[in-house]
Amino acid sequence: MRSVISRIDLRGNPADPRASLPRAEIDVASAVEKVRPICEDVRHRGVEALIELGERFDGVRPAHIRVPADALETALAGLDRTVRAALEEAIRRARIVHRDQRRTDTTTRVVPGGTVTERWVPVDRVGLYVPGGRAVYPSSVVMNVVPAQEAGVPSLAVASPPQAEFGGLPHPTILAACALLGVDEVYAVGGAQAIAMFAYGAGECAPVSMVTGPGNIWVAAAKRLLKGIIGIDSEAGPTEIAILADDTANPAYVAADLISQAEHDVVAASVLVTPSTALADRVEAELARQVPAAKHRERITQALGGPQSGIVLVDDIDHGLDVVNAYAPEHLEVMTADAQSVAARVRNAGAIFIGDHSPVSLGDYCAGSNHVLPTGGVAVHSSGLSVQSFLRGIHVVEYDRAALAEVAHHVVALAEAEDLPAHGAAVTARIPREEQQA
């Protein structure tokens, strides 16, 4: 029987493995030109454009762009008790972790009379995007709102697509999650037009300084187009998991975790990296057993069978570490002997999950960690969403006259070396040359 997932044999191949591990191709650049007129329309026509675009793309003409307060209250009152308890626990754990990420101001005494203070200041206003479509993601509300709140952001707004099924409002579970978090500024706007609304402002929605949150290719394209007008977290691409495992790993767990990521999208990447052909065989057998029983088996089968997924055979764990560090996955699970020591050698990953009992799905919801993570290999230079994402470090410089006099001649020398004499003159106006220390 044909395996649901391909094998990639890198044994004996020390070359850069990235060419052998293709990712799904998402052409954000060409999408930018398609969202440009949408963003310009929102810029110039505001709410009128947003209502028309909602009808065009979401199949419903929302009666209100801003969700009324009573709709938030109604959604919370109607939330399933089990889901509410789970969301409250996810919020509680996320607050524990993100509260501990807060930065404190530090003052460094460079010389007597000369200090530099690093002051951490939250972004003034943030727009948080929560996608609709194939699935409902109240967890994305938690993961975006909690770090912003813990950073001290004074003004938060959430946007999520209007749903015809719910009378032009976002999904009630999204609204309930907002209510649980105390967010009362919510907009029934989706896609690129939501990012444009945040960037330019429209109606009751004042412009924001920063936009975070996942979305489809059109959301990513709008973020790219408007970056500079707004700060962004990232251009989220298809989700991905890599699992570094040896023959001590439980194949049923490995298969279940590969499937859980493939469940997201047909272009989701599920990659197992292992030196054990025996484990590879057992995982393939588990996939053959588990996939047919999955609710979204067609989507999962496409994702596992796509070129972005595979079982990668390597020489040993050291080689496997080279592979995963080059791949820089969004999520990395380590299921090996001495997994903590192996995980400590990983340099490039959005988040790392260690051992048999730390599946990615735990991190998606209730580990306390954040699930907004870098995709597409950008974990080589970028981090996941955190309190730090919403803070700016401002250097505050304070020197007295004596401290300036001590270094004035160096400032003047460097200014003259760079042919910027007015820079030096700004110092000599305060400290005449004869008073500058040589």
Curated annotation (Swiss-Prot):
Question: Which domain of life does this protein belong to?
Answer: Bacteria
> What's one GO MF term for it?
histidinol dehydrogenase activity
Please give the cofactor(s) recorded in the UniProt entry for this protein.
Answer: Zn(2+)
Q: Which InterPro entries match?
A: Ald_DH/histidinol_DH, Histidinol_DH_CS, Histidinol_DH_monofunct, Hstdl_DH
Residues annotated as binding Zn(2+): 261, 264, 364, 423
Which parts of the sequence bind substrate?
239, 261, 264, 331, 364, 418, 423
**What is written in the cofactor note of this entry?**
Binds 1 zinc ion per subunit.
BP terms from Gene Ontology:
L-histidine biosynthetic process
Q: Which GO terms describe its cellular component?
A: cytosol
Q: Keywords on this record?
A: Amino-acid biosynthesis, Histidine biosynthesis, Metal-binding, NAD, Oxidoreductase, Zinc
Which EC number(s) does UniProt give? 1.1.1.23
Q: What does this protein do?
A: Catalyzes the sequential NAD-dependent oxidations of L-histidinol to L-histidinaldehyde and then to L-histidine.
Q: Which family does it belong to?
A: Belongs to the histidinol dehydrogenase family.
- Classification via NCBIfam families: hisD
Q: What's the protein name?
A: Histidinol dehydrogenase
